[in-house]
């Protein structure tokens, strides 16, 4: 009997020793960096709780429209961003590479193209070409015949790793982000866990067909938006809960500064709307465990070794803020319901609606602007 008990305890010991060795010593390839976030702002005052985004309806399908109803897999999944043309037609890119066009009533018109990658940020240029930040294939342009033209796949000799979002200036220059030159789209979680400054803000000049790096050492460079006067460009740094401003005109040209920081969530895409409002999509609210582990790279490496299903993720929570050109919060839009349309990855404003992208839904979201609070 004693011999049997000994064998059992020895087997348990070996199992635990193996598990501990795996969690602490197994190489991950990550080099997590310690960082020190500010205390997360409370959801009160300018970020007070509300359910305004409960007014979102699923859009971009001929069937199943309605609050939070996940649509049958017909057009694809994951419309991360939405572009809206002057006629109210909408364009969105999906997992698998398809880009689809819908009319203003949400009726499917046609497939624009298939990039064969992962189209993320979208914008229409001044002659109607659709410019696409494709995470896998770089910066692309799609003409009215559906022809795909690769604009750039590198900047100053360094290949694009994760092309994310873009905005187009009136002179045709395209400002765009490379979220991480080190970690690609399928491995974005690694960039979050590592918290290394692998992101870049870039500009492509169609006249010279050259790409220039404007800012580097960004912490997951995500959404990009030009100011209405085109004197500066904003880029979201998801992993730092902040938005950075880069001046492209004036006496500060070529310099950067923090536009707004210590946000209550993870900033994803950003766009400029009417009345000079910058709409910032927050992928989800801040997580206590993420901030707790910020200065503990050893523990983050252990967490990374755990099964993917055990990794902490933001809860289902719709969150969007609108700020003015000084970074002051003007709109605070939320829906904390577990059934909310979330995570929201982008916001685009038209005359009558706000449109919302998401990585998980089969359609994108839409809400009447009449539902916005009066400020």
For the regions a protein language model found, what residue spans apply to each?
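Sequence-structural signature of mature extracellular/luminal beta-sheet repeat domains
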Residues: 2-375
């Amino acid at each position: 009997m004693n011999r049997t008990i000994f064998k059992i305890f020895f087997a348990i010991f070996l199992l635990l020793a193996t598990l501990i060795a795996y969690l602490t010593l197994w190489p991950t390839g990550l080099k997590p960096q310690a960082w020190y976030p500010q205390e997360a702002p409370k959801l009160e005052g300018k970020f007070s709780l509300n359910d305004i985004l409960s007014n979102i309806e699923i859009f971009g399908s001929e069937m199943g429209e309605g609050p939070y109803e996940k649509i049958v897999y017909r057009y694809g999944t994951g419309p991360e961003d939405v572009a809206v043309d002057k006629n109210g037609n909408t364009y969105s890119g999906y997992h698998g590479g398809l880009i689809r066009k819908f009319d203003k009533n949400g009726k499917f018109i046609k497939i624009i193209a298939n990039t064969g990658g992962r189209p993320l940020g979208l914008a229409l240029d001044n002659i109607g070409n659709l410019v696409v930040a494709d995470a896998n294939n770089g910066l692309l342009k799609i003409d009215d015949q559906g022809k795909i033209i690769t604009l750039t796949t590198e900047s100053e000799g360094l290949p694009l790793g994760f092309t994310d979002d873009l905005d187009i200036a009136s002179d045709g220059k395209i400002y765009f982000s490379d979220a991480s030159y080190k970690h690609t789209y399928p491995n974005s979680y690694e960039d979050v866990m590592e918290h290394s400054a692998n992101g870049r803000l870039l500009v492509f000049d169609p006249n010279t067909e050259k790409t220039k790096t404007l800012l580097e050492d960004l912490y997951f460079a995500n959404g990009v938006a030009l100011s209405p006067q085109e004197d500066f460009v904003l880029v979201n740094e998801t992993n730092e809960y902040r938005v950075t401003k880069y001046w492209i005109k004036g006496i500060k040209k070529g310099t950067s500064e923090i536009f707004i920081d210590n946000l209550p969530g993870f900033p994803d895409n950003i766009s400029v709307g009417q009345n000079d409002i910058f709409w910032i999509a927050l992928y989800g609210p801040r997580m206590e465990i993420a901030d707790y582990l910020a200065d503990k790279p050893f523990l983050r490496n252990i967490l990374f070794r755990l099964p993917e299903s055990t990794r902490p993720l933001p809860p289902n929570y719709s969150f969007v803020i609108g700020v003015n050109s000084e970074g002051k919060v003007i709109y605070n839009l939320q829906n904390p319901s577990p059934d909310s349309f979330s995570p929201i990855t982008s916001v685009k404003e038209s005359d009558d609606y706000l449109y919302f992208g998401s990585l998980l839904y089969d359609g994108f979201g839409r809400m009447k602007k009449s539902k916005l609070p009066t400020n």
